[in-house]
């Protein structure tokens, strides 16, 4: 999974990236300090994996990972190449989802590119640039197929879809809120346009330390972000990038103590992972043994053979059965053999839909 972190200058974008990935990306109090996208790989926190690793005394524990890309800052006119617009638009097109950092804190020492803190305006600035870019893509498609569509029913059908999506965008709406017809062709066409405004989006409301304890409930800027996110089907999580930067230098016990002192249950990374998995419809299944315990990320609704294919294509091709037990049931019973004796280990076939927290042993023959 690849997430692109975006935002206007001086909203805390690179500070957040630095703290999440400890990659040391340059962060400064002036626009355009992020020219090329910085990439960092972050392990997905998963207590279940640690418990299983201890249970099996595994030689190796391998968590799932998320790739973060700190994308060049965007300003008004990016769709026309202003600022670092061309690089921004090219880089953002490659990610699975967008993490849009929005400034929701007041600080006279940190300049705002527009002179004041206004998350609604900031969100609209970036969203409009993405819309303009998408409209250009659709215009090019219309120009390419309009003439042929007069004599080709399939192209005529696609032209109707393209024009409908364009009208939706020109109304100031994001492509992800467009209701694509329940038709295989339409679904494929829409996906093929790879529209920026169709990408799932998570808003990271960057607040001051004082707003963390109540999750931004008393911050009017956060309320506005939540309102806008609800309208466009996006997720929101509240974070203090400055605190995350401080947490990045602490060990696990120190982090836990620091968060407790702040009255906060979860770190920003934990919140972001949860929001990402929720938005993208992802779950994790686990493989476990003495050699290795590992978490594998899949889409909800994935069937056993396709889950096996995440490990190796041979597993999917030669799939026979999947021996499945919930991780907690396995731990509670002390061993896989004991769980088998109690009848709580399932032998599942090709139609089994994998569940979050399943520990699976695949049987295959190639």
Pin down the residues of each PLM region.
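Short, intrinsically disordered, mixed-charge
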Residues: 22, 54, 90, 128, ...
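Short capping/connector residues at structural and topological boundaries
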Residues: 6, 32, 37-40, 47-49, ...
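C-terminal-of-GTPase-core extension/linker across diverse P-loop GTPases
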Residues: 2-6, 17, 146-353, 360, ...
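Conserved G1/Walker A P-loop phosphate-binding module
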Residues: 1-111, 139-140
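Amphipathic alpha-helical transducer elements in NTP-driven molecular machines
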Residues: 32, 46-49, 62-68, 82-95, ...
